[in-house]
């Protein structure tokens, strides 16, 4: 697979749900010769949508990576989901892409999720171009859509095509670079098209938009600008070179149009991907940390450098088992070699390497910088966001940041058989998706699943039922409360047991204090929620018994004294004690420590804590008052506001308990135009009247 880096395009196709993204990808695969029959999403037959739920719901959930060829270039396409609960997938794919095509619905224009995806692409500085789709639909308006890209996204559109005819009369586009019309023949499934004269009724408009295009691109090159201003002709080659330069530097975003469903506009879109979107060489470097020095630096993207790759997706394939998708940033890799997972410091042997075409696979022996391949048979240790690297030159590529899950549900298997299958299913699903977590509630023994939203967990449960055949009962969403103490207290407790044979004896004297009151906290202890220290001198408690005290406290603190929630943010210091030569043991000290905790904690003025979320709402100006009013009614504290593009970002701290159902409220407050994200920030005391209600429920 050795090839020139400049001939590779790693692109994503991203958009709002239903803008026609999967259909566009399908057409690309058809015209590049990878699909023999065009899959239609509304028939449930699209090649990219290969999980059962996707074919039923007609939405794309898993970003499938596909390789195809156009004009001797290799295009790796990542199809990304457009639903807000799956933004983790979008983030993850944007991280490994070099460029993107944003698909817009020609009727609806820029929709809320288009804004979210656009802002995520801004975060990773992904160069992109726009494809205004569905030009054949009733109410399609290309020019309105271009205005919305300008106003709603605050982006600079560079129109390089104009539609010929609208709605059912849409038959082609005017290419403003070549200044010719491109018209498709209906009967050839869009495979045949011809260049023609621009229709008379469009000549004036084409001239006007061509002048705008030239005004924008010549700004990027002083020589060509002089030539243009002196009235000389700017060549097609020069225009293309400048459009490429401006696209890669995000000076503007080329806008094309078409109707993927009606097979019009796809080939020029492919030409534009090749002509204007970057190759790995244009991106040049990737950020990372050199393991030996801990220094952060930019590593060159090149085949001659040592091997490094980022695992960006793990997927279960019914035929091959677990697949790890990697983007190779530097060097090359062949099957049979051993590399190191630098995040986990574990070796991995490379077995089968596959090039994926949506649902078909092709075995390859080698992958090099710029490639996106799937590895079969890696150990379970490699998870999303890990780096695989050369053992001699270890690097950790920039970690992807995954949001904390914000909603949790209890799931209970219906039978013993289901219980075993559920454990396996959940661990597999969590390996695929870092925004999904599972844990076991120590008290109730229930399994708790946590995710990014209700649809996210719904799909997880659905996959558990279908792929792993697990039947389970589902509980209502819950909040994870905690407890702590607010003042220091000292306890002297003696545990004695004498009942024939060997007895038990242990005495401990412990000081419990809130972490915030501890002076001279060591650096490594600053992020801990519980610290144990022994200040025993002179052997009052022999060394070998002290771990028993720590173990007892660690176990018992999982069940607090107010409502049974785990105790956090306190320090326990063992200052004195006593032992018996025969009757003392590690177990006796463990029991004594637990009893000291139960007796001491109520004296430390314990309080209930709740998770406080950092909430960011991005809303158009006109809904700002309503959004802030609603956040205040949820015990929220608004921290500030800042403009972003033409919207306002409201930052606030809000208790998680008040955020259930927020997505629906926000939708109705803003007619679906506002979006929000929230991440866990800190724990804070629960107000007394709220705490009383929680205690009563327990």
Swiss-Prot record:
Subcellular compartments: Cytoplasm
GO molecular function terms listed in the Swiss-Prot or TrEMBL record: GTP binding; GTPase activity; translation elongation factor activity
The keyword GTP-binding belongs to this UniProt entry's keyword annotation: yes
UniProt keywords, alphabetically: Cytoplasm, Elongation factor, GTP-binding, Nucleotide-binding, Protein biosynthesis
GO terms (BP aspect): ribosome disassembly
Binding site for GTP: 15-22, 79-83, 133-136
Main subcellular location of this protein, as a coarse class: cytoplasm
Disulfide bridges in this chain: none
GO CC entries: cytoplasm
Sequence ranges assigned to domain tr-type G in this UniProt record: 6-281
PROSITE patterns: G_TR_1, G_TR_2
Nucleotide-binding keyword on record: yes
HAMAP family xref list: EF_G_EF_2_B
Main function: Catalyzes the GTP-dependent ribosomal translocation step during translation elongation. During this step, the ribosome changes from the pre-translocational (PRE) to the post-translocational (POST) state as the newly formed A-site-bound peptidyl-tRNA and P-site-bound deacylated tRNA move to the P and E sites, respectively. Catalyzes the coordinated movement of the two tRNA molecules, the mRNA and conformational changes in the ribosome.
NCBIfam families, sorted: EF-G, PRK12740.1-5, small_GTP
Sequence similarity: Belongs to the TRAFAC class translation factor GTPase superfamily. Classic translation factor GTPase family. EF-G/EF-2 subfamily.
Protein name: Elongation factor G
Species annotation: Rickettsia bellii (strain RML369-C)
Gene name, Swiss-Prot/TrEMBL: fusA
């Amino acid at each position: 697979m050795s090839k020139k880096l400049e001939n590779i395009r790693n692109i994503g196709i991203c958009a709002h749900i239903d803008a026609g993204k999967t259909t566009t990808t399908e057409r690309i695969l058809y015209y590049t010769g990878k699909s023999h029959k065009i899959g239609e999403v509304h028939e449930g037959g699209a090649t990219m949508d290969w999980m059962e739920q996707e074919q039923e719901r007609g939405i794309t959930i898993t970003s499938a990576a596909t390789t195809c060829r156009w004009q001797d270039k290799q295009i790796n396409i990542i199809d990304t989901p457009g639903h807000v609960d799956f933004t983790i997938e979008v983030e993850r794919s944007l991280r490994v892409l070099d460029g993107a095509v944003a698909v817009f619905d020609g009727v609806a224009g820029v929709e809320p999720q288009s804004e979210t995806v656009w802002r995520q692409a801004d975060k990773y500085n992904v160069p992109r171009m726009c494809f205004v789709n569905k030009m054949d639909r009733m109410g399609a308006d290309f020019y309105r859509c271009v205005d919305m890209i300008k106003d709603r996204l605050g982006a600079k559109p560079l129109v390089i095509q104009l539609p010929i005819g609208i709605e059912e009369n849409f038959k082609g586009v005017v290419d403003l670079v070549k200044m010719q019309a491109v018209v498709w023949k209906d009967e050839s499934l869009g495979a045949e098209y011809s260049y023609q004269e621009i229709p008379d009724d469009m000549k004036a408009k084409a001239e006007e938009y061509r002048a705008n295009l030239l005004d924008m691109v010549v700004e990027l090159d002083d020589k060509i600008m002089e030539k243009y201003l002196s009235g000389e002709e700017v060549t097609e080659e020069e225009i293309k070179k400048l459009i490429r330069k401006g696209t890669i530097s995000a000076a503007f975003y080329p806008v094309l149009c078409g109707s993927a469903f009606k097979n019009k506009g796809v080939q020029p879109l492919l030409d534009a991907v090749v002509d204007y979107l970057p190759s790995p060489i244009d991106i040049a470097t990737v950020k990372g940390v050199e393991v030996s020095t801990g220094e952060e630096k930019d590593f060159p993207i090149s085949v001659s450098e040592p091997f490094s790759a980022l695992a960006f997706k793990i997927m279960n394939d019914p035929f091959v088992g677990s697949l790890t998708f990697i983007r190779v940033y530097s060097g090359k890799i062949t099957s049979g070699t051993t590399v190191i997972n630098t995040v986990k410091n574990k070796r991995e042997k490379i077995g089968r390497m596959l090039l994926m075409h949506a649902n078909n696979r092709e075995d390859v022996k080698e992958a090099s910088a710029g490639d996106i391949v799937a590895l079969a048979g890696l150990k379970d240790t490699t998870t999303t966001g890990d780096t695989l690297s050369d053992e001699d030159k270890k690097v950790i590529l920039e970690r992807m940041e995954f949001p904390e899950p914000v909603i949790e549900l209890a799931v209970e298997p219906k039978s013993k058989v289901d219980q075993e299958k559920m454990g396996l299913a959940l661990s597999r699903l969590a390996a695929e998706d870092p925004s999904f977590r599972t844990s076991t509630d120590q008290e109730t023994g229930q399994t708790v699943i946590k995710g990014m939203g209700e649809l996210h967990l719904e799909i997880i449960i659905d996959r558990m039922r279908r792929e792993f055949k697990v039947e389970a009962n589902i509980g209502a969403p819950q909040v994870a409360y905690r407890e702590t103490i607010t003042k220091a207290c000292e306890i002297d407790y003696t545990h004695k047991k004498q009942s024939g044979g060997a007895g038990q004896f242990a005495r401990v004297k412990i000081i419990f204090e809130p972490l915030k009151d501890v002076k001279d906290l060591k650096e490594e202890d600053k992020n801990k929620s519980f610290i144990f220290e022994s200040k025993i001198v002179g052997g009052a408690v022999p060394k070998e018994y002290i771990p028993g005290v720590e173990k007892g406290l660690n176990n018992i603190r999982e069940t607090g004294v107010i409502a049974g929630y785990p105790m956090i943010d306190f320090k326990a210091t063992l200052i004195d004690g006593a032992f018996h030569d025969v009757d003392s043991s590690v177990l006796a000290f463990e029991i004594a420590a637990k009893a000291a905790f139960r007796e001491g904690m109520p004296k430390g003025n314990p309080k209930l804590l709740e998770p406080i979320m950092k909430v960011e709402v991005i809303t158009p100006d006109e809904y700002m008052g309503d959004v802030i009013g609603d956040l205040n009614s949820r015990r929220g504290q608004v921290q500030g506001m800042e403009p972003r593009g033409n919207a306002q970002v409201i930052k606030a701290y809000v208790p998680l308990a008040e955020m259930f159902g927020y997505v629906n409220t926000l939708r109705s407050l803003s007619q679906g135009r506002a979006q929000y994200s929230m991440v866990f920030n800190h724990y804070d005391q629960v107000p007394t009247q709220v705490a009383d209600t929680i205690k009563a429920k327990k």
